Amino acid sequence: MSMTPREIVSELDAHIIGQNEAKRAVAIALRNRWRRMQLPEDLRQEVTPKNILMIGPTGVGKTEIARRLAKLANAPFIKVEATKFTEVGYVGKEVDSIIKDLTDVAVKLVKSQAVEKNRMRAQDAAEDRILDVLLPPAKDQWGNVQESDNSSTRQVFRKKLREGQLDDKEIEIDVAAQVSVEIMTPPGMEEMTSQLQSLFEGMSPNKTKKRKMKIKDALKVMVDEEAAKLVNPEELKQQAIEAVEQHGIVFIDEIDKICKKGEHSGGDVSREGVQRDLLPIIEGSTVNTKHGMVKTDHILFICSGAFQVARPSDLLPELQGRLPIRVELKSLTKEDFERILTEPNASLTLQYRELMKTEGVEIEFTKDGISKIAESAFRVNEKTENIGARRLHTVLERLMDGISFDASERSGEKIVIDEKYVQAALNDVVENEDLSRFIL
């Protein structure tokens, strides 16, 4: 991650409106990962990540920041829901599985990078295999391959292959047969399932089977096969574990749902027990995964929650201490809604315009129309539950319902969505609180 904090914020701005404080905190945390790697080895071990707690109502951009961060980080990244885990000793997923899943993500990431690195060599080897099918080498009477005298013909075919002239020609090739072993186990035993699957798949011999396919498809399959041959699995595991330990990022959503609310007591195994299990992982411990032992000392944890019923102070004091950076995300205003409808790279209005364009219908959202949509969503949020920007999805879906249904019969038309159109479509539902509670 060599992007500067300003570049990271700029990238997030293209998809998320407002919440500059949260963007800055995340950008600094990401950049600090890179800064730490530039330090001398002895000092590097002493610099631990400053974990983040994002606090804000639902629908203001907490999860979206995580999604965009995953694409930007180019590092092992996993997003989990705190409510999915149970305390050790109960049926359900244990907190350790976060690190196990993160390591699986890292193995896939490192493998894809290694395959990409070897793609040129793999491409040449795959082309040779296809040319061997198209131009079988001559053999002598004892079955030995003779020195080829058709090198010029082979070069002509290689040129055609690279130019795509042979793409639609069908050939029969030998491809590795994928051995698939399905094992059914009770919930909470996913680790045992994956170990048994690996065991049985490792015991089966490497078989090939003949398949007939177009050359362009065969080339993709063969490039992947050849690239996989050039990769050392043991080396990959070591690189993946190092990537997790030095660059891993864990995003834990809905952390407020595992808070102990007030003086509540009882056998709720998904609350305080889960917090206690999270403590050693966030503080730094060693987790045993199927790829090897992983130290969590330098993994960055970003936690988020709405904290509408519970408060951050309801978290265990030790856990609060391990989340030193607090960021509060603001509730969205009508002006924010207007910007969300128009400014992001893939804004909602753009999505609907492009969807209807596939049917030959042109949609135009006027400025006053967008303002009215934003106002309607904001009013419904005020009168009923405030679900933030997610309300725009329900309002727009209601608004576009008729157009979406009739679009295939209205090809060639231009539909202007202005203030009057929005008022006619939404006014009854927005004004009637009972209707808006159930429909919007």
From Swiss-Prot:
One of its GO terms (molecular function) is proteasome-activating activity. CDD domains: RecA-like_HslU. It comes from the Bacteria. SMART domains: AAA (SM00382), ClpB_D2-small (SM01086). It is found in: Cytoplasm. GO terms for biological process: protein unfolding; proteolysis involved in protein catabolic process. GO terms for cellular component: HslUV protease complex. ATP binds at I17, G59, V60, G61, K62, T63, E64, D253, E318, R390. SUPFAM superfamilies: P-loop containing nucleoside triphosphate hydrolases. Belongs to the ClpX chaperone family. HslU subfamily. A double ring-shaped homohexamer of HslV is capped on each side by a ring-shaped HslU homohexamer. The assembly of the HslU/HslV complex is dependent on binding of ATP. This is ATP-dependent protease ATPase subunit HslU. It comes from Actinobacillus pleuropneumoniae serotype 5b (strain L20). The lineage of its organism: Bacteria, Pseudomonadati, Pseudomonadota, Gammaproteobacteria, Pasteurellales.
